[in-house]
């Protein structure tokens, strides 16, 4: 039985938390009065941070599946156990939703979003309706994670 999370699990946890908080700062600037080139650069920075978080998230899931998690205290009331598990599952679900909605939203714009200088998340399709719809889901997931 696992008593504590592995050191690598803790490192991934805090790296993800720090990158997500810094990335939220970048994302807050999208709605301002930025020049087009600055907005595109911010989107690339945001997407790059998102891809790093995606890698860490997948690694986190693999480690969780492989090594598990510490048991909750036996003295914890049943309702708290349920809420703790629900909150943890909700956080994982929302992180996955955030990743998928971010990548999908980028796919509905033809503005170049080249991550690591290697691949373009955007496409030839410029569908403002779908972009706004999926970006709304992305923003919802962001706000829900903040609320948790």
Where are these regions (language model features)?
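Membrane-embedded alpha-helical bundles that constitute the cytochrome b-like, heme-associated redox core
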Residues: 1-148
């Amino acid at each position: 039985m696992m008593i504590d999370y592995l050191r690598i699990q803790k490192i991934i946890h805090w790296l993800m938390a720090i990158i997500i908080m810094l990335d939220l700062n970048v994302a807050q600037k999208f709605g301002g009065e930025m020049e087009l080139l600055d907005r595109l650069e911010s989107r690339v920075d945001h997407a790059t941070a998102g891809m790093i978080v995606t890698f860490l998230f997948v690694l986190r899931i693999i480690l969780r599946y492989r090594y598990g998690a510490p048991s909750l205290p036996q003295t914890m009331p049943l309702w708290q156990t349920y809420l703790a598990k629900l909150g943890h599952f909700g956080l994982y679900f929302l992180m996955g939703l955030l990743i998928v909605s971010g990548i999908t939203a980028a796919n509905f714009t033809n503005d170049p979003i080249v991550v690591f200088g290697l691949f373009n998340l955007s496409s030839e399709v410029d569908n403002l309706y779908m972009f706004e719809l999926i970006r709304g889901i992305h923003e919802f997931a962001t706000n829900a994670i903040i609320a948790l």
